Amino acid sequence: MSRTVFCTFLNREAEGLDFQSYPGDLGKRIYDHISKEAWGQWMAKQTMLINEKKLNMMNPDDRSLLAREMEKFLFEGHDVHIEGYTPPNQ
């Protein structure tokens, strides 16, 4: 049986993550308060960020940038801005 969380990103009850997929306190916070659906949306944005900004996950500065963007996206309601990208609906 899947677990349910109140997703702070979607602002409603939704299916929770199966396991803590990010380390540390931030990972615990994500596991407790972010749904699978919201995490999937972040994963898509993360992929775009890594590709468009040519981030190197071996570089601590790039990992820090990604962690900051993730926290802003999931918990503060900020969308990820990728220069030159126009969503398909617009």
From Swiss-Prot:
Monomer. One of its GO terms (molecular function) is iron ion binding. This is Probable Fe(2+)-trafficking protein. InterPro entries: Fe_traffick_prot_YggX (IPR007457), Fe_traffick_prot_YggX_sf (IPR036766). One of its GO terms (cellular component) is cytosol. Belongs to the Fe(2+)-trafficking protein family. It comes from Edwardsiella ictaluri (strain 93-146). GO terms for biological process: cellular response to oxidative stress. Could be a mediator in iron transactions between iron acquisition and iron-requiring processes, such as synthesis and/or repair of Fe-S clusters in biosynthetic enzymes. NCBIfam families: PRK05408.1 (NF003817). Keywords: Iron. It holds the Pfam family Iron_traffic.
